[in-house]
Amino acid sequence: MSMKGRESGMPDEAYWASFFETEIAIDKLIGTAVLGNVIEFGCGYGSFTVPTARRTTGRVIALDIEPEMVDCVRQKAVTFDLPNVQADVRDFVAHGTGVDSGSQAHAMIFNLLHLEQPISLLREAYRTLQEGGVLSVIHWRSDIPTPRGPSLEIRPTPEQCRAWIADAGFHSIASVDLQDCCPFHFGLLARR
């Protein structure tokens, strides 16, 4: 059984890209360099995959349940000469990521914590991260109307996400101000 999340359909790529200044967001969430591998839960069009791959010394493992999204990311990896991108079709909600425990320096969970089992997803991210590894989370804000995103009723608040992140074992949870680059989103960072 597929675990495609509720209200997870993607809009047109150009419209989707209009919601984010991805380079600025990735600078704030990832930094200018990641030493090691990055895992991306739900890569979509690769909006965040490409800038992340440019900043990491290791691989970016970009996972999505939708084959057409993975194909899009693979094509971008070729177009932008990013051989460190490994895009795979994977139902990580139902089956986990399939990567070794402690093998990742950074885990990205962007626009996914409205799914039915957010703590399970966060625990899988925790499992993949090396000691001291970083989790970055962004999600659609629930306190304002937005032009896209899941219904307001199922969007988690930053406070809910912080509690879930802590329940999954993370510490040093901090807010990241994304208003200049992703005005419809909030950001959080945490450490394993």
Predicted regions and their residues:
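Class I SAM-dependent methyltransferase SAM/SAH-binding core
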Residues: I39, Y45-S47, P51-H95
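Conserved class I S-adenosyl-L-methionine
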Residues: S136-Q160
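A short acidic, Gly/Pro-enriched loop at the edge of an enzyme's catalytic core
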Residues: T97-H106
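Conserved alpha-helix/loop element of class I SAM-dependent methyltransferases that forms part
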Residues: A17-G36
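A short SAM/SAH-binding and catalytic strip from SAM-dependent methyltransferases
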Residues: A105-P118
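A short glycine-rich, Lys/Arg-flanked "PGG" loop and its adjoining helix->strand segment in the class I
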Residues: S120-V134
